[in-house]
Amino acid sequence: CKPNLMQCNTSFVILDPKGEILRDTGKLLESKGYEVRVLDLISMEKSHCYNPFVYLQNDNDVQKLVTNLFKSTTPKGSQAQDPFWDTSASMLLLALVFYLHYEAPEDEQNFAMIMEMLRAGAIEDEEDTRPSPLDELFAELEMSNPDHIALKYYRSYHSGAAKTLKSIQITLAARLEKFNL
C-alpha cells in the first residue's frame, strides 16, 4: 500500500485501523498537495465529521438512512424479542429526521440536533400530561402543515401511553448513544 501511496498519482481512500499508514505517509501526501482527512470512530476529537443529512435528497433517502442506522446498530446474531420497540423507535426517528430535513436550516440538520430534539421530548413524569417542547414543536407544524410527513410518523409514535412513549424514547436513545460523544 505504501509504495502506491508514495507515487502520489491519484486520490486515495485508505483503511488504516492502526493509524500506521497515516503516520508514515500523511506528511508526504500533504507536502504533495493532498488534503488528508481522517475518519476516526474511536477518537472522535481527532476525526473529520460525516453528516449523512447532506446527502438526503428525497423521502426515500430518509427512509434508507433510518433503516440503515437501525441495521448497523443491531448486534450481529441478535433477534429482537419484540419488534414493537424498534419499529416504534424507528417511527420516532423518522419523524425527527423528516422534520429537520424539511423544516430546519442546514446547520441544524445533523444527529446532534436529533439528540437535542429527543431530550426535548423526554417524559420525566408519566403522570404529567403537559406537552413537552417536542410536542409543542410538532403542534406548531400541525397548524402550518397538517399533512407534513414528519407529523404522520410523530402521530404514529405518539399514540401510546406515557410509559410506552418513555420506553420508545429510551430504545431510540440507546440506538443513538454514539451521537452524544
What is each PLM-predicted segment?
Residues C1-L181:
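P-loop NTPase motor domains
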